[in-house]
Amino acid sequence: MPNILHRDGIAAEPARVFEALTTVEGIRNWWSSETHGDASEGGTFQFRRNRLEVLHAEPSLVKWRYSGPAEDWVGTEIVFRLEWRDGQTFVLFSHEGWREPNEFMHHCSTKWATFLLSLKDLVEKGEGRPDPMDTKIAVGA
C-alpha cells in the first residue's frame, strides 16, 4: 500500500508541537478551524463530517485512524513522529494505508505539505493557516 511522506523541521521543543497535535484547540489552529471532539489518546475528533480516532498520543508519536466518510481515507492512519535534534523538532509525517496512488492521493500529499507548514507557523509564529484560510492548490481546494 502506498503512503504519503513528509518531513518538517520546527524551531521549537517537541512539547509545543505535541500540544498542537493532541488538543482540539491546537488542531483547530493549523489544520481545520471546524475541529471539535477529543484529540487525546483514545478520543475521537471531527472536522466537518470527517472522523478520526486517536490511536497514540505520546511525546514522540501521535497516530490517528480515519473512519469516514471519505472513502479513499477510510482505514488510513496519519502518523506524526517527533524527533528533537539540532535545536529543532523534526516532524516525520506519514499518511499510511492508501489502497492505490490515485489522483486524490496526489492532491492530499500536496495539501498535507501545506498543513505541515501551517503547523510550523502555528508553533513558531503563533498563527497557522487552517482550513478555510489554508493555501489553495486548485480552484476551490
What are these regions (language model features)?
Residues 17-21, 27, 45, 54, ...:
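Hydrophobic pocket/interface hotspot
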Residues 29, 73-76, 101-107:
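A short, polar/proline- and glycine-enriched secondary-structure boundary/capping micro-motif
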Residues 36, 45-99:
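Hydrophobic-ligand binding "helix-grip"
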Residues 97-141:
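A conserved amphipathic terminal alpha-helix motif
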Residues 1-36, 141:
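Hydrophobic ligand-binding cavity/cleft-lining segments
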